[in-house]
Amino acid sequence: MKILLLGIGNVLYADEGVGVHFVNYLTENYRFSHPEHQIDLVDGGTLAHSLIPTLTQYDHLIVIDTVNAAGVGAGEVYFFDFDKAPAEIDWQGSAHEVEMLQTLIMMELVGDRPKTFVLGVTPTVLEPMHMGLTPKIHAAIPVIESAILNHLRELGVTCERINNIEINSLIPTAYKRGMEA
């Protein structure tokens, strides 16, 4: 089985970049292995539709992003099967969130969507550009980390901690990392 951890988001808009920042954090701090499965981590930025050729190569997809949820405050973490989204998830967030939803729906229509899970956190809405995470999203990082590690372990993946780099130290160079991929 091929497993993809896909970080989505716009690093120029604070919390909207949490998926990208978190995938960079995992890349720097963990080594994932399984004797039979391939595990890849990708910074998908705001590419959405352009990711389709990549996404079709995987059997199991975990999208890490912000999610909009009606009546829920910033910093709430959700982990769900894309086919069974909680009722409060309204997909009315940023442009990249809507595009990713459309991408997954298009892939489903043609039978190319892998089994998909969403690991999302509700963002603080900020209008001006700002590279960094708000305090509520930063406080949610351990919950996000625990959710992804538990899910991978359920799949039999070994999650080995190889570093202890803070997510905030990775943010200033996030835009460069996406270009290197």
What is the role of each PLM region?
Residues I3-L6, V11-K84:
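Nucleotide and nucleotide-moiety/phosphate-recognizing core
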Residues G17, H21, T46, A95-L101, ...:
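Conserved active-site and cofactor/substrate-binding residues in soluble primary-metabolism enzymes
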Residues M1-K2, K115:
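Secondary-structure boundary/capping motif
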Residues G7, V72-G75, G93, P128, ...:
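Residue-level signal for pocket-adjacent positions within structured domains
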Residues M100-A181:
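Phosphate-binding/catalytic loops
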Residues T66-T116:
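Helix-loop-strand module that forms the ligand-binding subsite of alpha/beta enzymes
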